[in-house]
Amino acid sequence: MSTVDFSSSNQTTFLITPLCDNGSNFADYEPKVKVLCGAKGILKFLEGHAQKPKELHVANGVFMKPGTIDKPATEEEIENAETKMDTYEQNEAMCKHILMSSVSPHLCLKIKSLATPNSMWVAICTDVKNKSTLQKMDVR
């Protein structure tokens, strides 16, 4: 089975053997996905602990300072909030990409519509655990 290549910005390459549709290589796949997510700083998305940044309140089309409803935010505060949200969304998308590109097309169809990387990960783990011993041993 071929491997999936994930390169980082500093040219470090991580290789993961995709999860077999029958889950027979899950013992190898699971720690590699966790290490890859940890190396990319996105393990909290996989585990469901990522906290979405708070959005700035908008009143009459004007962004308000964090924690207020009547004081306009500065340009720096707006940019900071947008940067935090962009980073969060990019990291969430990266985690989803890792999961979707490292499972079989059949399993990808099952998980692609799930909202979070954690819900995808839970679905992958559940799918593997629901495979019978006979199915796992049948593939050699």
What does each of the following model-derived ranges do?
Residues 1-140:
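N-terminal Lys/Arg-enriched interaction segments
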